[in-house]
């Protein structure tokens, strides 16, 4: 478990937050059951190292002036222009109790349907899971190599290894392979012609 040192802070004025960020630290909040919310400041580089190496759902041992808590990051506020973290929220977790978390879905492999000109559609980029903190995956890897045109991958198709469960209906669509656009257009045009032709025949009969 990664250890991250933090200092409790009492000054929440904007000028104070600005000074914290300018010094290379990140303001944050730690909260949880049986714990009064605490405002903290921590090293931004160390936090980034942990998240990049172990993922957002990793358990961190947050050391606040010698008082240690097992926490997970629940929210990160970032500055897209500077590619930096400007605020972090940490939740104290019970290592033996199940909790909910969102996990990114990583599709791997090249689907057969894409090789045939199909188009990949991915409605779900994250899945909500329930598990003990140590069993929450950092990513859910799904091999889509076997998917062909018109195939659909649902939540129920993705195994869980038994140590976590999905908070979704089994038939929720994670990914699908749509037919090539030209094929769809041709089928649509053909269907339109089939509808128009009987109408023309009816008009000729009326004229007779």
UniProtKB/Swiss-Prot annotation:
Gene Ontology annotations of biological process type: translation
Biased composition (Basic and acidic residues): 198-208
This protein's GO CC annotations: cytosolic large ribosomal subunit
Presence of keyword Magnesium: no
GO MF annotations in UniProt: 5S rRNA binding; structural constituent of ribosome
Function per UniProt: This is one of the proteins that binds to the 5S RNA in the ribosome where it forms part of the central protuberance.
Xref: NCBIfam families: bL25_bact_ctc, PRK05618.2-4
Subunit structure: Part of the 50S ribosomal subunit; part of the 5S rRNA/L5/L18/L25 subcomplex. Contacts the 5S rRNA. Binds to the 5S rRNA independently of L5 and L18.
Name the record gives this protein: Large ribosomal subunit protein bL25
């Amino acid at each position: 478990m990664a250890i991250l040192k933090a200092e409790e802070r009492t000054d929440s004025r904007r000028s104070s937050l600005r000074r914290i960020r300018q010094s290379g630290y990140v303001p944050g909040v730690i909260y949880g059951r049986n714990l009064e919310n605490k405002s903290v400041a921590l090293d931004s580089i160390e936090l980034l190292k942990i998240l990049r190496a172990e993922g957002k759902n990793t358990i961190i041992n947050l050391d606040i002036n010698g008082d240690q808590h097992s926490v997970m990051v629940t929210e990160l506020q970032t500055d897209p222009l500077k590619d930096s973290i400007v605020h972090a929220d940490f939740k104290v977790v019970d290592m033996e109790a199940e909790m909910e978390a969102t996990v990114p879905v990583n599709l791997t492999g090249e689907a057969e349907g894409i090789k045939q000109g199909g188009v990949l559609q991915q409605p779900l980029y994250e899945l909500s899971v329930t598990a003990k903190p140590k069993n929450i995956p950092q990513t859910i890897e799904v091999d889509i190599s076997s998917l062909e045109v018109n195939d659909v991958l649902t939540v129920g198709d993705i195994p869980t290894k038994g140590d976590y469960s999905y908070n979704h209906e089994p038939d929720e669509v994670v990914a699908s392979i749509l037919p090539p656009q030209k094929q769809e257009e041709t089928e649509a045009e053909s269907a339109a012609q089939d509808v128009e032709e009987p109408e023309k025949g009816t008009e000729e009969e009326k004229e007779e």
